[in-house]
Amino acid sequence: MEQDKIQHGTTSANNNPVKNNGINLHMFSELSAQFEQYFNKRHFPALPATLYDAAQYLLTVKGKRIRPVMCLMSNELFDQINKDAWHVATAIELFHNFTLVHDDIMDKAPLRRNMPTVHTKYGESTALLAGDVMLVAAYESINKIDSAFIHSVLAIFNETSKKVCEGQQLDIDFEKMSSVSFEDYENMIGLKTSVLLAASMQMGAVLGGAGLGNQQHLYEFGKNLGLAFQVQDDYLDAFGNPEKFGKKTGGDILANKKTFLLIETMNKCSASHKKELMELMQHQHNDDNKIDKVIGIYKSCKVDEWAKELKQKYMAKALMHLDDVAVLSLRKKPLEQLAHYLLDRES
């Protein structure tokens, strides 16, 4: 790939990107700020307030907005970002928050983004309805598309929605199983987490007029980046610095949650380690001793090093597909930098 040079993160006084060789490029931080301003509005009617205030509540608690911004970045690979991409980015964020509301109910989670979850604040019945109207609002946003690509976008969006539900059900099924294969777990994460990143990239490309080959490469870029992102999440929960991670480590261990680390350890460690680990996972007490023992087993089995290698494997595959996208390499630099940032993060 040709090594074009770009001055990253440089903007003019009005926060528009500076032209580099005649090409306008936005970095993630720039588009994230622009999307936040675009998205930060009332998405629902005033009444009944008991329903729509609950739906609006989570949207006002700022998240990373990774998925909608990746849609915009994918769209910009092919030309200036068009208004249809903003509608789809909004739909993606609404859909993502819909899944969070329902996931939190299923997980009985008390907090989301350090704030009470929707069902904790408003009750489970209202939270279910609030999630439902978010999904409806997502489709309303897609219906605002003017271009001839609306049918293609809807097909991708519908298929993605179905896959996310399939992934969530597999996750629920795995909770009842004593062991899960790496392949089955990878498939579940691919459906539950990665597919929305992949679809965000593909829909942005479709709206940019990309051909099927470029669409597929960007889909695979998003999919593998999502898998690498999950490996990093699992790694940080066990081995991260709590001050940088933003919360106490070991949460997945205390919750007996199946992760890449646990799956690999159960499948590859010695019989004695496996027995000890199974006994610990049946231990319901939330204490640091359990966390320390499980992490000790992880280190003995060297799954910390394995996780780093697995993350790099997914990362390399993602970047390979990005490299194969048939646009100027200069245009791909912001996505390449974003990929490295997401996977080198410590929080």
Which residues does each predicted region cover?
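All-alpha prenyltransferase/terpene-synthase fold signal
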Residues: 1-347
